[in-house]
Amino acid sequence: MGKKLVMAQKRGETRALCLGVAMVVCAAITYYVLGTTVLPLYQKSVWTQESICHLIETNIKDQEELEGKKVPQYPCLWVNVSAVGRWAMLYHTEDTRDQNQQCSYIPRNLDNYQTALADVKKVRANFYKHHEFYCLSAPQVNETSVVYQRLYGPQVLLFSFFWPTFLLTGGLLLIAMVKLNRSLSILAAQK
């Protein structure tokens, strides 16, 4: 009976040790992936200066109003603000500016025009409720645009690195507990 218990204990310890090592390896791989994808995007972002934006005007540009230019197939919200002592065009995120420089906000659902228009009107109403809000600007003097939020800000970075850190800590604790259990069982066997 005693030999079977020792064998089962060793098998369980081996499995727990393998689980701990697997957790540490997965955390290392996740750190590598995040370090090569999210971290460079965070470091590349120039939108670092936080300021207070004052709403000047908003306008919903429709397909008819954009004649002669590349016409988007969705309603376009254009927001003009005063930030850091100058007039600026507000963009929802950095990607919004890259997708269409004429639009401050691009609706999520572009399949249905009426749903997209309702979404744009809802966002416009929120701007009228809050005339002052925080925005991010680039430190360059001649920059005439600001963003409402960064895609890869400090919160996203913290949340992205939380789970691999949790996995790494759990794996290391599991390995430490197995090693402690082995050393305590050796000490108990010597007595």
UniProtKB/Swiss-Prot annotation:
Main location: membrane
Localisation per UniProt entry: Membrane
MF (Gene Ontology): calcium-activated potassium channel activity
Cytoplasmic side stretches: 1-18, 177-191
Tissue: Expressed in many tissues containing smooth muscles. In brain and heart, it is not expressed except in the vasculature, such as cerebral arteries, aorta and corona arteries.
Alphabetical UniProt keywords: Glycoprotein, Ion channel, Ion transport, Membrane, Transmembrane, Transmembrane helix, Transport
Function: Regulatory subunit of the calcium activated potassium KCNMA1 (maxiK) channel. Modulates the calcium sensitivity and gating kinetics of KCNMA1, thereby contributing to KCNMA1 channel diversity. Increases the apparent Ca(2+)/voltage sensitivity of the KCNMA1 channel. It also modifies KCNMA1 channel kinetics and alters its pharmacological properties. It slows down the activation and the deactivation kinetics of the channel. Acts as a negative regulator of smooth muscle contraction by enhancing the calcium sensitivity to KCNMA1.
Name listed for the protein in its UniProt record: Calcium-activated potassium channel subunit beta-1
Annotated source species: Mus musculus
Classification lineage: Eukaryota, Metazoa, Chordata, Craniata, Vertebrata
Name of the encoding gene: Kcnmb1
